C-alpha cells in the first residue's frame, strides 16, 4: 500500500500521497462548472448550494463517500468556494482527542466549511464532541479535574461539516444520521476521464491528441487521480522518447513500459489472477493461501488489489474463497471452466 509521503508502490494505486498533494491542487477544478463527471452529485449539490445561499444559511452537513481518488477532497473545496466560505481541513486519524476537535470548532468563523477526511476513523470520544456541534452548534467542555471538574457549554457559529470516507459502512449510525446530504461518488467512464486528462494536459501545458488522452483514460481504472498520475508519466515518456506530443501510439508505448495494460491491470493484478487460475484451479481459494502463493500481505490483496478486479468482473469473493470468472480466463487466454469447480483451499 502507498506510503503517506512517498510515491505509490503501484502507479495505478488510487490512494494519494503527500508528494502528490501540490500537483493535485494545481489540477483541481475550483467550481461546479469546471467539475467533470458525477453528474447526479454535481446537479444535486448545485441545487442545495444555491438554496442555502438564497436563505443565507450554511449548507447542510454533507457526507461524501466512495473509492479513493474520485474527488471527495476536490468537492469539499468546491463546496467552500461556491458558498463563499473558508475551508478548514483535518482528518479522522489526526483528531485523536476531544480537545483537538474542540480547538478547531471554537476557531471557526460563521459559514466556514470544516472538512474531515477519513471521518470513519474518528474515535468514539471525539464523535461525542461532534454530535452537539453538528445538531445545535455547541460543544460541552469539561474544565478542571476530579471533584472540581465542571462542564460548560460553548456556542459555535453556524458551519458546514463535510465528511469524506472510503468506507461508509464503518460510520456509526448516530454520526451518519446527522448528515443532511449524503452523496456517493462512483468510478468514472472512459469518456469523462478523457475530458479530465485533456483538461489536466492543458493545465500542464502538454500537447495531447484526443486519442492519446483516451488511451490514458482507458487504463486509469475509472479514477481521476490515477489518470492524472499516468498523464504525468506519459508526458515524461513523450518528452524523452517522442517529440513531446502525446498521441495514441506514444501513450500506448508509455503504458507498455509502465506495465499497465489496456484494462488498467498491472503485474500484481495479473499475478493474483494467474495464481487463482493456474495454482488453485480457478478457486475457490482462501485469501491467506492466495497471499502466500504470490508473496503478498493479506491486507494488501484485500484492500488494494482485489477491489478493482472484483468491480471489473475478473474475480468473485464467495463464502468459500476467491473464484476466477470467465472474464479472467479470457484475459489470461485460458479455456474457461465453471466458476468454483476447483478444490477448496483455506
Swiss-Prot record:
Chain sites annotated for binding Mg(2+): 73
Alphabetized Gene3D superfamilies for the sequence: 1.10.8.60, P-loop containing nucleotide triphosphate hydrolases, Winged helix-like DNA-binding domain superfamily/Winged helix DNA-binding domain
Record text on subunit structure and interactions: Homohexamer. Forms an RuvA(8)-RuvB(12)-Holliday junction (HJ) complex. HJ DNA is sandwiched between 2 RuvA tetramers; dsDNA enters through RuvA and exits via RuvB. An RuvB hexamer assembles on each DNA strand where it exits the tetramer. Each RuvB hexamer is contacted by two RuvA subunits (via domain III) on 2 adjacent RuvB subunits; this complex drives branch migration. In the full resolvosome a probable DNA-RuvA(4)-RuvB(12)-RuvC(2) complex forms which resolves the HJ.
Gene Ontology MF: a single term: ATP hydrolysis activity
Keyword tags: ATP-binding, Cytoplasm, DNA damage, DNA recombination, DNA repair, DNA-binding, Hydrolase, Nucleotide-binding
A GO CC annotation given for this chain: Holliday junction resolvase complex
EC number: 3.6.4.-
Coiled-coil annotated spans: none
Keyword DNA repair: yes
The record's note on its domains: Has 3 domains, the large (RuvB-L) and small ATPase (RuvB-S) domains and the C-terminal head (RuvB-H) domain. The head domain binds DNA, while the ATPase domains jointly bind ATP, ADP or are empty depending on the state of the subunit in the translocation cycle. During a single DNA translocation step the structure of each domain remains the same, but their relative positions change.
Origin species: Halorhodospira halophila (strain DSM 244 / SL1) (Ectothiorhodospira halophila (strain DSM 244 / SL1))
Gene Ontology biological process terms, A to Z: DNA recombination; DNA repair
Gene transcribed to yield this protein: ruvB
Sequence positions that bind DNA: 298, 317, 322
Family label: Belongs to the RuvB family.
Binding site for ATP: 27-28, 69, 72-74, 135-137, 178, 188, 225
Database matches in Pfam families: AAA_lid_4 (PF17864), RuvB_C (PF05491), RuvB_N (PF05496)
Cited PANTHER family: HOLLIDAY JUNCTION BRANCH MIGRATION COMPLEX SUBUNIT RUVB, PTHR42848
SUPFAM superfamilies assigned: P-loop containing nucleoside triphosphate hydrolases, Winged helix' DNA-binding domain
Region feature Head domain (RuvB-H), mapped onto this chain: 262-346
Catalytic activity: ATP + H2O = ADP + phosphate + H(+)
Source organism superkingdom: Bacteria
Region (Small ATPAse domain (RuvB-S)): 189-259
Name under which the protein is recorded: Holliday junction branch migration complex subunit RuvB
Protein task: The RuvA-RuvB-RuvC complex processes Holliday junction (HJ) DNA during genetic recombination and DNA repair, while the RuvA-RuvB complex plays an important role in the rescue of blocked DNA replication forks via replication fork reversal (RFR). RuvA specifically binds to HJ cruciform DNA, conferring on it an open structure. The RuvB hexamer acts as an ATP-dependent pump, pulling dsDNA into and through the RuvAB complex. RuvB forms 2 homohexamers on either side of HJ DNA bound by 1 or 2 RuvA tetramers; 4 subunits per hexamer contact DNA at a time.
Annotated compartments: Cytoplasm
Region Large ATPase domain (RuvB-L), residue ranges: 1-188
Amino acid at each position: 500500500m502507498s506510503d503517506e509521503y512517498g510515491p505509490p508502490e503501484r502507479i495505478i494505486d488510487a490512494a494519494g500521497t503527500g508528494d502528490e498533494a501540490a500537483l493535485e491542487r494545481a489540477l483541481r477544478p475550483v467550481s461546479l462548472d469546471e467539475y467533470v463527471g458525477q453528474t447526479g452529485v454535481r446537479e444535486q449539490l448545485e441545487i442545495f448550494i444555491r438554496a442555502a445561499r438564497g436563505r443565507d444559511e450554511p449548507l447542510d452537513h454533507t457526507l461524501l463517500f466512495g473509492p479513493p481518488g474520485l474527488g471527495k477532497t476536490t468537492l469539499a473545496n468546491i463546496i467552500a468556494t461556491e458558498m463563499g466560505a473558508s475551508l478548514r481541513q483535518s482528518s479522522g486519524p489526526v483528531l485523536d482527542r476531544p480537545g483537538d476537535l474542540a480547538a478547531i470548532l471554537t476557531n471557526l468563523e460563521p459559514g466556514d466549511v470544516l472538512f474531515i477526511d477519513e471521518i470513519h476513523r474518528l474515535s468514539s470520544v471525539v464523535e461525542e464532541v461532534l454530535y452537539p456541534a453538528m445538531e445545535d452548534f455547541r460543544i460541552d467542555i469539561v474544565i478542571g479535574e476530579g471533584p472540581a471538574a465542571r462542564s460548560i457549554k460553548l456556542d459555535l457559529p453556524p458551519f458546514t461539516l463535510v465528511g469524506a470516507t472510503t468506507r461508509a459502512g464503518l460510520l456509526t449510525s448516530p454520526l451518519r444520521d446527522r448528515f443532511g446530504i449524503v452523496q456517493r461518488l462512483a468510478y468514472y467512464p472512459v469518456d469523462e476521464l478523457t475530458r479530465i486528462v485533456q483538461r489536466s494536459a492543458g493545465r500542464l501545458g502538454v500537447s495531447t491528441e484526443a486519442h492519446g488522452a483516451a488511451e490514458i483514460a482507458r487504463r486509469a481504472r475509472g479514477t481521476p487521480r490515477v489518470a492524472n498520475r499516468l498523464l504525468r508519466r506519459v508526458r515524461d515518456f513523450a518528452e524523452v522518447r517522442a517529440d513531446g506530443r502525446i498521441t495514441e501510439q506514444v501513450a500506448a508505448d508509455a503504458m507498455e513500459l509502465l506495465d499497465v495494460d489496456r484494462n488498467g491491470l498491472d503485474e500484481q493484478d495479473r499475478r493474483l489472477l494467474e495464481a487463482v487460475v493456474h495454482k488453485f484451479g480457478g478457486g475457490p481459494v482462501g485469501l491467506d493461501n492466495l497471499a502466500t502463493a504470490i508473496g503478498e500481505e493479506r491486507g494488501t490483496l484485500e484492500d488494494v488489489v482485489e477491489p478493482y478486479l472484483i468491480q471489473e468482473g475478473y474475480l468473485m469473493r464467495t463464502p468459500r474463497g476467491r473464484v476466477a470468472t470467465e472474464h479472467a480466463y479470457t484475459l489470461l487466454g485460458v479455456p474457461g471452466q465453471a466458476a468454483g469447480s476447483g478444490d477448496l483451499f483455506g
